[in-house]
Amino acid sequence: MKTYDIVVIGGGPGGYVAAIRASKEGKKVALIEQGHLGGTCLNRGCIPSKALLKHAEMIHAIRDASKYGIEVGDMRLSLPKMMQRKNQVINQLRGGIAHLLRTGNIDFYHGKAEIQPDQIVEITGDKPERIKAGSIIIATGSSPAVPPIEGLEQVAYHTSDTIFDIEKIPASLAIIGGGVIGVEFASIFESLGTKVTIIEMADRILATEDEMASQVLTKHVGKRGITILTKAKVAAVKALGSQKQLMIYNEAGAKQDVVAEEILVAIGRRPNLSASANLSLDMDGPFIKVNVRMETSVPNLYAIGDVVGNWQLAHVASAEGIVAALNATGHATDMEYHIVPRCIYTYPEIASVGLSEREAKEKGFQIKTSMYQLAVNGKALASGQAEGFVKLIADETYGEIVGAVMVGPHVTEMISQISAYMQLEGTVEEMANLIFPHPTVSEGLLEAASDWLGKGIHS
């Protein structure tokens, strides 16, 4: 039986990062993955969706070309070619991870892992094997959650795991869930010419995000023909010829039917726990309970990523993976969650970090906010993408930035600048004293900071 210092179960953005970091600390490491390297993010999530969102961006640019004095003829879409490009991106990144594992001298096992007593890991698959670990890191991720809707299992429906495998563009699509996954797919399919309906139980889409950001996106997607039903619950689904009929009730009990060719269920995700089924772990609801060092209730057993809840984000899983690897290799390190950037790749983009206004007030902060509208930003106007804003949330006494929300072009790239400021306990005054390049959307940060101080030039 082979023995390793550390065995990582799961090859997603948390698992493979943990394995590589542990290897760089001089440990003998094994990584087990039952699917493809890269996990959900690379194969069925972050990366393929961004590849298709790029297609959506290009489609809209072509459709809007006449606004810029460019006349084009009829546009033809090839879904097979789009999927081919998406798969090329995935395969290239998969190969990159495999190369990193090889150069890091990490043993890779393809199969399903189950943790047995005494740090034994049993691997089933093409080549069954048992290995022993000094420490184990569980990074098995999550799967799409499917609600118990009457009739849903009797019709064909999609989740984020299967929607990337469609073979033709649907004429209509009903999306159950108006969170991040739902609105991103709505943007993709609307660009392809699909009639999209979003059905959301809350009173707005992106209910956990900034309310004004949600309002801006709601207004924009409405202009593009996407129908949004809020305070709505799908009670039943049934086949209607080649289509599906969704029976929906609003909070007042009024019934409304939506007919669509395809259904996408996007209500959230549930943790994959089969690897630890033989263990008596302390749980936090459906998730594995861990401390700030990513340690579970079982000695020498760590858990990271979607199985522990917290933030179900790839970059958080990677950060947790590094923390777990460091602790497993004898370097005491705590995980920090107060500066987690969050990005939504819709049109316009949404990005945020730190505390919202509500959260800051609940934590007892005396805060002051400022906002700069991109409608007066030169670069945004020149680019034809002037819908959006930059909002800064800062401590009223010292001006320390505790949170930010941005809506507009390139904000998913800009948010890291705010994260860096917060990490260094930066203030709005320090930001207002920076020289920003002109013309850029990032000048919105300067304007918002200056406005917070009551010294804004363009606000």
Predicted regions and their residues:
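Beta1/beta-strand and adjacent pyrophosphate-binding region of the FAD-binding site
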Residues: 1-12, 169-179
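Glycine-rich flavin
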Residues: 2-4, 20-27, 32-169, 197, ...
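Short hydrophobic core segments
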Residues: 7-9, 113, 131-141, 176, ...
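Flexible, glycine-rich terminal cap/loop adjacent to redox cofactors
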Residues: 9-14, 23-35, 40, 47, ...
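N-terminal Rossmann-fold NAD(P) dinucleotide-binding loop
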Residues: 15, 182-183
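Gly/Ala-rich phosphate-binding loop of Rossmann-like dinucleotide-binding domains
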Residues: 19, 23, 186, 190-191
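FAD-binding beta-loop-beta segment adjacent to the flavin cofactor pocket
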Residues: 144, 286-300, 379-391, 395
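FAD-site-proximal beta/loop scaffold in flavoenzymes
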Residues: 153-170, 257-328
